[in-house]
């Protein structure tokens, strides 16, 4: 993202200039709607958050082939997995040079999407508290009241049987450096997901009653 007349990572921008400046940079890079909040965290933090939900059943069809799964003693059948085991498996994939970062990201999306879908009624009670407990490790512009608001929104969604949706954004991955760089394809995917017009930067859905 742009920062101090150069490009840098979200983590470096956050450490140097704080959450508000990072929000400005993200909005500029991804053409986000006005008022958008952001929440980013590492795989380690995600594992700690997901561990509150217990084991879930995950299928990797569409993310990994049968041969790829067999290398790690797994199959394409839906299988039970804990947050810790999922994190370990994903780390193995990331370290395996035979797997592209894009394939690893697809597997990661499949795993954590399953954790969020496991029991919608748990989300309002557990996710905000789990995020608060890991607040020092988050990259976010959430204020204290935003975690409460998140719980309210999640409760509304759970009561109306809304389902979480996870996607792995396209972009430029550098496996050795462990970095991800936003590209034109990344921007287009975000704009499609949020129904954002690149010209206006506004979400049409936000204008609906």
Model-derived regions, located:
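Flexible, polar/acidic helix-loop-strand segments at domain edges
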Residues: 51-131
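Short, surface-exposed acidic
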Residues: 32-35, 117-128, 146-149, 202
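Second-shell loop/turn segments in exported
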Residues: 8-17, 31-37, 94-103, 119-120, ...
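C-terminal solvent-exposed extensions
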Residues: 1-7, 139-209
């Amino acid at each position: 993202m742009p920062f101090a007349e150069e490009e840098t990572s979200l983590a470096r921008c956050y450490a140097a200039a704080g959450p508000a400046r990072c929000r400005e940079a993200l909005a500029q890079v991804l053409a986000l709607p006005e008022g958008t909040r952001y929440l980013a965290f590492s795989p380690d933090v995600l594992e700690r958050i997901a561990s509150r939900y217990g084991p879930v059943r995950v299928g990797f069809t569409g993310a990994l082939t049968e041969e790829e799964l067999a290398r790690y003693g797994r199959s394409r059948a839906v299988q039970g997995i804990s947050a810790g085991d999922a994190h370990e498996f994903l780390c193995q994939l990331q370290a395996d040079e035979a797997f592209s970062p894009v394939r690893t990201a697809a597997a990661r999306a499949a795993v954590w999407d399953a954790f969020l879908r496991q029991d919608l009624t748990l989300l309002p009670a557990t996710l905000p508290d789990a995020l608060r407990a890991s607040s020092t490790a988050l990259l976010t512009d959430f204020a204290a009241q935003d975690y409460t608001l998140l719980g309210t929104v999640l409760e509304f969604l759970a009561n109306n049987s809304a389902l979480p949706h996870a996607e792995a954004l396209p972009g430029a991955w550098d496996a050795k450096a462990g970095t991800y760089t936003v590209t034109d394809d990344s921007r287009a995917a975000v704009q499609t997901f949020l129904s954002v017009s690149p010209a206006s930067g506004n979400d049409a859905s936000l204008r609906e009653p």
